[in-house]
Amino acid sequence: MGRKNSPSAKKELVTLITNYEEAKAENRQLYLDADQLADIADWYASERKFEEAQEVITYGLKIHPGNTDLLIEQAYLYLDTQKLQKAKKVADSITEDFDSEVKLLKAELLLNGGKLEEAQWLLSTIADADELETIIDVVFLYLDMGYPDAAKEWLDRGKSRYTEDEEYMALTADYLASTHQVESAIIYYNKLIDKSPFNPSYWMGLVKCYFVQEQIDKAIEACDFALAADDQYGEAYAYKAHCFFYLNNSDDAIENYQKAIELKAIPPELGYMFIDRKSVV
């Protein structure tokens, strides 16, 4: 669900996860609010640690039965693990229909079933529809589900109010890249880098654009800048590996795939598939 976007929020989340894992390792009780447990589960799911995410949710619902945040995370976890009917059942059990996160979840389930008009109507009823956080969530939902025109409608909703806002600029860049408007996306990513040169996600935006354009040397250089900003940024290792794979540089490709697997940036089976192909060349 991507709740933790700002650097301060990410720092708080890292501390929270560290405290949770230390308490678990020591078999020590640690009381956490439902929203804290939901954030931990969300992080585990984003790292493809689905069993750990389920453990947190199960524990959370024992001490916070029926909590909306935890039920939302449970539904998304079922979606992540291709258990659509279970996800629907959990979503239907949530009583807070007015909650914007609930509406986003139910809209995703509708889009999974190809029910675009129903999803559009549901999203139009979100109370804080003109807030930037909501616009970002809805644009990415439509893009992820393959509805770029619907995404553009919501992107335009924020243009007059947020056009100079860094988060809105990042959203615009990602929209342009996702809809194959690569040159325009590059312009936006460079503007974002001028604002925040140590944000690895902006450099990764450039990487993907250059990779699509087959400007491999520029893509590798942008990967290096992303890793200079965050040497644990697994996606940069994955794309750097793809670049070396493209250049038939087996040793560097394998080294970077191994690092990407270690950081859980790509599924191990995918990484080892590339490594095996390079090993026999």
Locate the predicted segments by residue.
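Canonical tetratricopeptide repeat
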Residues: E73, L105, D137, L171, ...
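Start-of-helix register in tetratricopeptide repeats
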Residues: D35, D69, E101, E133, ...
